[in-house]
């Protein structure tokens, strides 16, 4: 009977494969050199609809093409975070020997996965002092970078290159090489398009699905397939039930052996389905020095996070779920499923996990060394406490909003957006973390009905009142984060007066009464710098829109990103701001400018509903962590 069940399952698999054969023929995972690849990569002998990046595997070292019929680059390494490091060997050889002549004809395709830097190749007669440069030996010219707009660049020619090409050395001297990395981020609907037999194509900055298996003429084929599967499933259930009755006594006698087999199959299931490494409990116990208190990074609502170093030398953050949390397995599986389907530079990377039948449930993340945004804004007795300049705060807001917009485009709601879940790397780049409460929102529904969960001070009042979770719930929480960034105040502070314990209530009250200056942190230069005053007031206005009680009045995260980038453009145009030293150069204020002038055209609700209503939920995430996932 077991053989019959296996054969029936295999038959169903063949039926499903045949239904999509016309769309997926020739598209499969493959090995190229020493690396394994899958979509969005494809081999030269595969159809172009199989991916976005073509790989040539005919030589020992694979090569990649960034655009159709474009130049071939050598692949140096591939990481689990969808980052691929490549090199232009001919140009690199030229640069290594000190020749820069090939740079003049160098160009890269327009790509959202590359950060570009502008180099200036200048005649030695136009030599620049005080800025980093790399000599172009014997060619009568030198190579410079970090030249500001206010410097004379006559006798120089600009060259666009990847940021990673310039490697600082001693003093002002730098090395230039032709090695760079691509961090590839695709929305979830692009992967679904590929899995449905379609071709995901890039059109400007968006992606379009062509030829997915959803045409009306497939109706009868899908009907026949559905009937076949339905009948076969019923037959399989009957056979499995009979098999269970016959072998019940055998299972009781050999329970311990079956338990070991189940653990093995669970590990294999995790490796195959989620495609992430499985760590043993002993390895992570050793990596964290037996979960030493000295390695403690933070305590959260669902677990404790420890610093560790695994066998291959990588620094990691190990999340140890609380044993008393009856939902820990659900949160464990939920976070793995979500993080393995997402790839974005501003989302924390999941390196692996233990088996779900392990002694303890442990999740292994990349280690983010610079703490959380909350640490830097108002943390006490933390190693990361320090002042964030206005330009840094605006950049943090944009990167966080971009990550949330990417989640929403992939039909995922974070549900626990807060400053303790926004981590900062060495360069103060954002990494959004903690997906234990995240939910998948099907594209054909407007909301999901679920009991409110989250952190007090950040929870959408409409979600709390109506039990309707939408992507606008994340928008509300992000509005609180925006207010924290401009005010340097925590989301909840019981030392404030009762009506202003929640920062959202305080912000709405100040903005409606044209008292934004009382809300904004004066250390940012609000009183002395016109540009800072204008931009912080504009962010306050955007936060006010995000905090509307009626979620239909709130913007989408995509609109929030657009508005924040527009504000950043104002910063770049402002002549009163010195970006290198973060110093303020005051100028006289125009007579028609001020927070009242900026906000006077906003249509504020007369009496917004306060979100300070007390409520109790055992499922909430307490705001107690300095490093919380």
From Swiss-Prot:
Residues 247-629 are cytoplasmic. Residues 291-565 form the Protein kinase domain. It is found in: Cell membrane. The chain crosses the membrane at residues 226-246. Residues 609-629 are annotated as: Disordered. The modification Phosphotyrosine is found at residues 365, 463. GO terms for molecular function: ATP binding; polysaccharide binding; protein serine kinase activity; protein serine/threonine kinase activity. Its EC number is 2.7.11.1. Residues 20-225 are extracellular. GO terms for cellular component: plasma membrane. InterPro entries: Kinase-like_dom_sf, Prot_kinase_dom, Protein_kinase_ATP_BS, Ser-Thr/Tyr_kinase_cat_dom, Ser/Thr_kinase_AS, WAK_GUB. This is LEAF RUST 10 DISEASE-RESISTANCE LOCUS RECEPTOR-LIKE PROTEIN KINASE-like 1.1. Glycans are attached at residues 56, 92, 123-124, 172, 177. The modification Phosphothreonine is found at residues 450, 455. Keywords: ATP-binding, Cell membrane, Glycoprotein, Kinase, Membrane, Nucleotide-binding, Phosphoprotein, Receptor, Serine/threonine-protein kinase, Signal, Transferase, Transmembrane, Transmembrane helix. The active site is at 416 (proton acceptor). ATP binds at residues 297-305, 319. The keyword Phosphoprotein applies. It is a single-pass type I membrane protein. It catalyses: L-seryl-[protein] + ATP = O-phospho-L-seryl-[protein] + ADP + H(+); L-threonyl-[protein] + ATP = O-phospho-L-threonyl-[protein] + ADP + H(+). Belongs to the protein kinase superfamily. Ser/Thr protein kinase family.
């Amino acid at each position: 009977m077991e053989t019959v069940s296996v054969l029936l399952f295999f038959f169903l698999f063949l039926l499903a494969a045949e239904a999509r054969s016309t769309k997926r023929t020739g598209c499969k995972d493959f090995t190229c050199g020493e690396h394994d690849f899958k979509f969005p990569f494809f081999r030269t002998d595969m159809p172009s609809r199989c991916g976005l990046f073509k790989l040539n595997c005919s030589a020992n070292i694979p090569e990649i093409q960034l655009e159709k019929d474009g130049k071939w680059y050598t692949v140096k390494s591939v990481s689990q975070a969808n980052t691929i490091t490549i090199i232009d060997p001919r140009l690199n050889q030229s640069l290594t020997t000190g020749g820069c002549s090939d740079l003049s004809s160098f160009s890269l395709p327009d790509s959202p996965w590359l950060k570009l830097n502008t180099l200036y190749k200048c005649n030695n007669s136009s030599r620049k002092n005080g800025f980093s440069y790399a000599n172009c030996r014997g060619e009568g010219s030198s190579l410079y970078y970090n030249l500001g707009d206010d410097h004379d660049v006559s006798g120089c020619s600009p060259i666009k290159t990847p940021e990673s090409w310039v490697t600082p050395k001693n003093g002002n001297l730098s090395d230039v090489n032709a090695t760079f990395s691509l961090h590839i981020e695709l929305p979830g609907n692009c992967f679904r398009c590929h899995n449905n037999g379609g071709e995901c194509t890039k059109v400007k900055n968006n992606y379009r699905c062509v030829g997915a298996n959803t045409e009306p003429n497939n109706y009868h084929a899908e009907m026949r397939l559905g009937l076949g599967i339905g009948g076969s499933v019923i037959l399989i259930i009957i056979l499995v039930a009979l098999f269970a009755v016959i072998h019940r006594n055998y299972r009781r006698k050999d329970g311990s052996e079956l338990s070991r087999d189940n653990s093995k199959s669970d590990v294999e299931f995790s490796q195959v389905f989620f495609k992430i490494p499985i760590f043993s409990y002993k390895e992570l116990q050793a990596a964290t020095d037996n979960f030493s208190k000295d390695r403690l990074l933070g305590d959260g609502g669902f677990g404790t996070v420890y610093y560790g170093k695994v066998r291959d030398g990588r620094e990691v953050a190990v999340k140890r779920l609380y044993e008393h949390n009856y939902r820990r397995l659900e949160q464990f599986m939920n976070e793995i499923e979500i993080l393995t389907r997402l790839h974005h530079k501003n989302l924390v990377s999941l390196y692996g996990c233990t088996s779900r039948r392990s002694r303890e449930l442990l999740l292994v993340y990349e280690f983010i060394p610079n703490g959380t945004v909350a640490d830097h804004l108002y943390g006490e007795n933390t190693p990361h406490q320090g002042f964030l300049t206005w330009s840094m705060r605006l950049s943090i807001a944009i990167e966080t909003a971009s990550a949330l917009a990417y989640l929403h485009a992939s039909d995922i709601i974070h549900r626990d957006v807060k400053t303790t879940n926004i981590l900062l790397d060495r360069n103060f780049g954002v990494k959004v973390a903690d997906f234990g409460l995240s939910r998948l929102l099907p594209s054909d529904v407007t909301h999901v009905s679920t009991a409110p969960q989250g952190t007090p001070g950040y929870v959408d009042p409409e979600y709390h009142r109506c039990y309707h979770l939408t992507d606008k719930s994340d928008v509300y929480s992000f509005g609180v984060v925006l207010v924290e960034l401009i005010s340097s105040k925590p989301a909840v502070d019981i030392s404030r007066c009762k009506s202003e314990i929640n920062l959202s209530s305080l912000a709405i009250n100040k903005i409606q009464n044209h008292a934004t200056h009382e809300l904004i942190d004066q250390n940012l230069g609000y009183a002395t710098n016109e540009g800072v005053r204008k931009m912080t007031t504009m962010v306050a206005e955007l936060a006010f829109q995000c905090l509307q009680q009626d979620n239909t009045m709130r913007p989408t995260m995509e609109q929030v990103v657009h508005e924040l980038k527009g504000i950043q453009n104002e910063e770049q145009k402002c002549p009163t701001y010195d970006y290198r030293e973060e110093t303020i150069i005051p100028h006289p204020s125009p007579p028609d400018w001020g927070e009242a002038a900026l906000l006077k055209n906003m249509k504020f609700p007369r009496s917004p509903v306060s979100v300070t209503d007390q409520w109790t939920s055992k499922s909430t995430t307490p705001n107690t962590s300095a490093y919380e996932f």
